[in-house]
């Protein structure tokens, strides 16, 4: 392994011999030692922590260390880890069989729960957010008879070929321009524009409107760090798309059922045509969905000509975990998530300000990021201009003090309803030293 993190007081990654041994073993048999790139710690240096269990707000690694979890499996774990209701739902479902390749009552119940919460008339269950957005794009093309798609730089919609152009998430984390293996033909129908720039959208529609099938946007960007839409951006996107005969696809894989009972739509509604969901709706298991008006969804096979399928779609275990989670996700739970996120954000901001570290706290509901910059952040270019070395120092100081943050400056922080006073006290205790570490690096860095 190559340690790319600079040595220095309070900044060097703590030794983690059990995780190091597991990572060495994994690197021999798994590309990069991980099954999703951001987990490898390449953006922050050091060895990824191998997690052996979670309970409530806590993660426990292979070396026996305990961390307050501010990643929450990248969003899904709104109840915390191993919630008794979810564990019991999984135990009961598994006892009846794990997969049948046939319809089940559970998938009907989960679909009904989504339709009750979200602005969709019909929904199709799939296994991942990538499948959901990929299928929504195919459906939009089939419905409109058009080919071209508008997306926004820094917005991540999964790793399907057509949507990896100028993507956020791991692509931003690793500093990749785009992905080799994506052919010009696959990406050729994708138009990439700056986020929050309606004038750019209007200009493209003026030039190429009859070719554009859909605009796809994250409901609030969460994969370049958290950047909320400005000036009614989503509503204005819908108006421009509809005026030109195109659809608007809103990707709520991250925000859906996390920031409110109805997802981002509950905070900032817009007249989108198709919506995608994931993460929370699976309760920590692989599950996602896309949905919209019945008129559009009826174009899907077996009733329509647009083909989409999946062996494990609507898996009974995933449906059981998702239902157990959503049935506990009431307004009181969302108030708790909002309050907890506000406290954590305030504590982080106060510590960084006291240490003299330039920063911007950017939020979308209870999702938030800390950008290490004093400039306004409103799109991918401004998000990318932050002081990444300062984040690295901050990350490792927090990790050493028992707080697990996303190992990337370009990801959202997430809270769970399980975060209690003890967890908040641990976060508060960790922040001053982490802010000091960031200040030390920031003072001698020109950015990255």
Swiss-Prot record:
Pfam families: Aminotran_3 (PF00202). Its cofactor is pyridoxal 5'-phosphate. GO terms for molecular function: glutamate-1-semialdehyde 2,1-aminomutase activity; pyridoxal phosphate binding; transaminase activity. The keyword Nucleotide-binding does not apply. It comes from the Bacteria. GO terms for cellular component: cytoplasm. Disulfide bonds: none annotated. Keywords: Cytoplasm, Isomerase, Porphyrin biosynthesis, Pyridoxal phosphate. Its main location: cytoplasm. GO terms for biological process: protoporphyrinogen IX biosynthetic process. It catalyses: (S)-4-amino-5-oxopentanoate = 5-aminolevulinate. Pathway: Porphyrin-containing compound metabolism; protoporphyrin-IX biosynthesis; 5-aminolevulinate from L-glutamyl-tRNA(Glu): step 2/2. It is an enzyme of class 5 (isomerase). The modification N6-(pyridoxal phosphate)lysine is found at residue 279. It is found in: Cytoplasm. Its EC number is 5.4.3.8. Gene3D superfamilies: Aspartate Aminotransferase, domain 1, Type I PLP-dependent aspartate aminotransferase-like (Major domain). Belongs to the class-III pyridoxal-phosphate-dependent aminotransferase family. HemL subfamily. Homodimer. NCBIfam families: hemL, PRK00062.1. This is Glutamate-1-semialdehyde 2,1-aminomutase. It comes from Salinispora tropica (strain ATCC BAA-916 / DSM 44818 / JCM 13857 / NBRC 105044 / CNB-440).
């Amino acid at each position: 392994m190559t340690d790319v993190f600079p040595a220095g007081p309070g900044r060097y990654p703590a030794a983690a011999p059990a995780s190091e041994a597991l990572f060495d073993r994994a690197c021999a048999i798994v590309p990069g030692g991980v099954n999703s790139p951001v987990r490898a710690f390449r953006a922050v240096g050091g060895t990824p922590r191998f997690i052996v269990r979670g309970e409530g707000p806590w993660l426990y690694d292979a070396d026996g260390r305990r961390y307050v979890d501010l990643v929450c499996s990248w969003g899904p774990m709104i109840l915390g880890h191993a919630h008794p209701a979810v564990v019991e739902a999984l135990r009961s479902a598994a006892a009846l069989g794990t997969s049948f390749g046939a319809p089940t009552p559970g998938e009907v119940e989960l679909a009904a729960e989504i339709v009750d919460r979200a602005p969709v008339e019909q929904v199709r269950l799939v296994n991942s957010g990538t499948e959901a957005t990929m299928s929504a794009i195919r459906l939009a093309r089939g419905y409109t008879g058009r080919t071209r798609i508008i997306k926004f730089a820094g917005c991540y919609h999964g790793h399907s070929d057509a949507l990896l152009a100028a993507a956020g998430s791991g692509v931003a984390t690793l500093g990749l321009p785009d992905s080799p293996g994506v052919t010009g033909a696959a990406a050729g129908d994708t138009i990439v524009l700056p986020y929050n720039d309606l004038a750019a959208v209007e200009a493209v529609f003026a030039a190429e409107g009859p070719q554009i099938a859909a605009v796809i946007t994250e409901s609030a960007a969460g994969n370049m760090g958290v950047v909320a839409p400005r000036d009614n951006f989503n509503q204005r996107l819908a108006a421009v798309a509809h005026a030109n005969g195109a659809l608007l696809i809103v990707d709520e894989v991250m925000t859906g059922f996390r920031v409110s009972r109805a997802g981002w739509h509950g905070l900032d509604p817009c007249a989108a045509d198709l919506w995608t969901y994931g993460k929370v709706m699976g309760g920590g298991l692989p599950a996602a969905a896309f949905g919209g008006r019945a008129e559009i969804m009826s174009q899907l096979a077996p009733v329509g000509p647009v083909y989409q399928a999946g062996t494990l779609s609507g898996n009974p275990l995933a449906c059981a975990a998702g239902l157990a989670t959503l049935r506990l996700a009431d307004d009181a739970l969302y108030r708790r998530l909002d309050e907890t996120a506000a406290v954590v954000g305030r504590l982080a901001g106060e510590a960084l300000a006291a240490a003299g570290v330039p920063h911007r706290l950017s939020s979308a509901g209870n999702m938030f990021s800390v950008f290490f910059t004093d400039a306004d952040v409103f799109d991918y270019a401004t998000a990318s201009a932050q002081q990444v070395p300062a984040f690295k120092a901050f990350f490792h100081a927090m990790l050493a003090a028992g707080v697990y943050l996303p190992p990337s400056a370009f990801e959202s922080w997430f809270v769970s309803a399980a975060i209690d006073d003890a967890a908040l006290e641990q976060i508060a205790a960790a922040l001053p030293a982490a802010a000091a570490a960031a200040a030390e690096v920031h003072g001698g860095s020109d950015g990255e």
